[in-house]
Design a protein with these regions (language model features):
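Amide-donor transfer/coupling interface in amidating biosynthetic enzymes
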Residues: 1, 109-158
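N-terminal beta1-alpha1 cap of cysteine-dependent amidohydrolase-like domains
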Residues: 1-61, 65-74
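A structural micro-motif
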Residues: 5, 28, 76, 98, ...
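Rossmann-like NAD(H)/NADP(H) cofactor-binding core
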Residues: 8, 79, 134
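Fold-independent oxyanion-binding glycine-rich loops
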Residues: 12-13, 33, 49-51, 81-83, ...
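Flexible, glycine-rich phosphate/dinucleotide-binding loops
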Residues: 16, 39, 87, 94, ...
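Cysteine-nucleophile active-site neighborhood
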Residues: 51-124
């Protein structure tokens, strides 16, 4: 069953195919965002895991950065995982770069260690059920900006 929404999945680098396949298995129409012209008619966006520095660089080189930033700032719904969170964050505590800066949080890159230190852990999601999380050089949300306490909600903690 199609939702009628077209979801753009950033496909310049990272774990985009897993997101696209899952959304398509749920009946969603997805488009891989590889160039600026792919952005024009999307109704929502997925920013996947990967390497945020590379993604930010490629978004600028492909002239996609400014349009995506503007669409996000104007309310385009976004699901962001790992590097996607870093791209959205307004502050990165251990990096001088800021990318879109549209999510009023401070994050720490690679907060859970190096690639070889990857692990899985169980956490409670939205006080309703337990689920397994995988940490692979994952970022950590250190703080939610005071001005956004009513707009940003923590769904799970580890």
């Amino acid at each position: 069953m199609k939702s009628g929404l077209k979801i753009g999945v950033l496909a310049v680098q990272g774990a985009f195919i897993e997101h696209k396949r899952m959304l398509e298995s749920l009946g969603c129409e997805c488009v891989e965002l590889r160039q600026k012209s792919d952005i024009c008619d999307i109704d929502a966006l997925v920013l996947p895991g990967g390497e945020s520095t590379v993604q930010g660089k490629l978004l600028r080189e492909l002239d996609m950065f400014d349009e995506l930033k503007e669409r996000i700032a104007n309310g385009l719904p976004v699901l962001a995982t790992c590097a996607g969170l870093i791209l959205l964050a307004s502050h990165i505590s251990n990096d001088d770069n800021v990318y879109f800066g549209t999510l009023p949080v401070t994050v720490k890159r690679n907060a859970y260690g190096r690639q070889l230190g990857s692990f899985e852990a169980t956490a409670r999601f939205d006080n309703s059920f337990d689920f397994t999380m995988t940490f692979i050089r994952a970022p950590y949300v250190e703080a939610i900006d005071a001005s956004a306490k009513n707009d940003v909600r923590v769904l799970a903690e580890y």
